[in-house]
Structure formats: structure tokens, C-alpha cells
UniProtKB/Swiss-Prot annotation:
Function per UniProt: As part of the MCIA complex, involved in the assembly of the mitochondrial complex I. Participates in constructing the membrane arm of complex I.
Transmembrane annotation, as ranges: 71-91, 109-129, 140-160, 198-218
Subcellular location: Mitochondrion membrane
UniProt-listed InterPro entries: TMEM126 (IPR009801)
Organism: Rattus norvegicus
Keyword presence, Signal: no
Keywords: Chaperone, Membrane, Mitochondrion, Transmembrane, Transmembrane helix
Gene Ontology CC, one term: mitochondrion
Protein name stated in the entry: Complex I assembly factor TMEM126B, mitochondrial
Keyword Transmembrane helix: yes
Subunit structure, as described in the record: Part of the mitochondrial complex I assembly/MCIA complex that comprises at least the core subunits TMEM126B, NDUFAF1, ECSIT and ACAD9 and complement subunits such as COA1 and TMEM186. Associates with the intermediate 370 kDa subcomplex of incompletely assembled complex I. Interacts with TMEM70.
Outcome of gene disruption: Reduction in respiration by about two-thirds, only when the electrons were fed into complex I via the NADH-linked substrates malate and glutamate in ADP-stimulated mitochondria.
Length: 229
């Protein structure tokens, strides 16, 4: 009977082991907490996989929506430039009294301003916003300048050139006198130049609103990607 009773050294060792187990379990509990958050175990991780997949799916869905909005805004901007090209072609054909090759001139005045606006806007606004190296004021300024350059100046110059060549080819306007060629053409198209003030104002306003809208969309996208600490 005496041999079955634990000796003093054995009971002391058992107490040390129990105390060590308590400390180890306490260390494990402390290790499971990091920055006030409980680290999930393997079992919790299995249950958390569907939640992570759902979060990633929502992230990708919001990214696709943002990309759709960006593309849609660029397309609308290009369409407005195409409409300005159609108006410029109509005005200068009337000024030069040209009635030939209407389909060819309207096709070029519709397509080229659209492509120029879309490409220029992507290079100077969209790419800059995605890199984060542009402010709101700079975004609005670039957008409005693109509207003026690609939506008014370029279509007007293109319509002047194409319809001026047709006017000379088909002799629909008097031949300019020597030494006054530029003045002659300016007098012929002064009415058309005044009429282009309407799309000029529209492109400036549309460029400002499009720049503000595009910047706000990118800011929301960055806020979702980079959460607050």
C-alpha cells in the first residue's frame, strides 16, 4: 500500500507538469489572438472559405461595374465628338455650297473624331486615374481640353479641309484672288465658325462633368480596394 502512494518528488513533478500545461494553454490562447482578432483554426478556415469566395466575387463584380462605367463615359464622350463632327460637316458644306460626296465626308467626320477622343481620353485621363498620379482639378482640366481639341477643333479643321477641297474641285465657290487666299476662305466660312460655338460650349461642359464623374468613380474603387485602418 505504501508503494502505491505517490512520493513527494512524484507529486511535485506532477504539479510542475500541470502548471506547465496551464502556461502552455495560456500561451496558445494568447497566440490565437493577434491585434485584437481571433486567428481562425483549421475548422473555422473550412467554414470561412465560402465567405472569402463571396467577398472576392463582390470585389470582382464591383471592379467590373467600375470598368463598365469608365468605358461608358469614354464612349459617351466620343459620341459627343462624333456629333460635333457631323455638325461641323453640315455647316461647312453649307458654307462652301458643296453637294457632292456627302457619304464619304460624313463617314470620316463621324469616325475620326470619335477615335481621336476615345484614344486621347484613355491616354491622358483614364490611365492617369488608374495610376493615381492625377488630382481632381487636373482630371477636369484634361477632360475639358480633350473635349475642345478632339470634339471641336479637330472636327472643324477636318470639315474645313475636306469640304474646301471639294469646293475647289467642283467649283462651287469663287476662286480666291492671289494674295488673299486665307482671307477669302475665312470670309466664306465665318458663319460656320460662329455656329461651332454651340458644340464648343457643350464640349466644355460635358468634359467638366465627365471628368468629375470619372474621378469620383475611381475614388470609390480605391476606397473599396484599400480599406481604412
Amino acid at each position: 500500500m505504501a508503494s502505491e502512494r505517490p512520493t513527494g518528488s512524484e507529486s511535485g513533478d506532477a504539479g510542475v507538469v500541470l502548471e506547465g500545461n496551464r502556461e502552455a494553454s495560456q500561451d496558445i490562447k494568447m497566440a490565437l489572438y493577434k491585434h485584437g482578432r481571433l486567428i481562425p483554426s483549421l475548422g473555422d478556415a473550412k467554414f470561412g472559405r465560402p465567405m472569402i469566395a463571396e467577398i472576392l466575387e463582390k470585389k470582382f463584380e464591383s471592379y467590373r461595374n467600375d470598368q463598365t462605367l469608365n468605358i461608358r463615359g469614354t464612349l459617351f464622350f466620343g459620341v459627343s465628338s462624333s456629333l460635333s463632327g457631323v455638325m461641323a460637316n453640315l455647316v461647312f458644306r453649307y458654307s462652301f455650297k458643296v453637294k457632292y460626296e456627302a457619304l464619304r465626308t460624313y463617314a470620316s467626320l463621324t469616325t475620326l473624331p470619335f477615335v481621336a477622343t476615345a484614344v486621347t481620353y484613355k491616354l491622358f485621363v483614364t490611365d492617369a486615374l488608374q495610376s493615381g498620379n492625377i488630382s481632381q482639378e487636373s482630371c477636369v482640366l484634361r477632360s475639358s481640353l480633350i473635349g475642345v481639341a478632339c470634339g471641336v477643333s479637330y472636327p472643324s479643321a477636318l470639315a474645313f479641309y475636306k469640304n474646301g477641297r471639294l469646293a475647289v474641285k467642283y467649283h462651287t465657290v469663287p476662286v480666291p484672288p492671289k494674295g488673299r487666299v486665307m482671307l477669302h476662305w475665312l470670309l466664306l466660312c465665318q458663319t460656320g465658325m460662329k455656329a461651332m460655338a454651340v458644340p464648343l460650349l457643350f464640349q466644355i461642359i460635358f468634359g467638366v462633368f465627365n471628368g468629375l464623374y470619372h474621378y469620383a468613380v475611381c475614388e470609390k474603387a480605391y476606397a473599396r480596394i484599400v480599406p481604412d485602418d
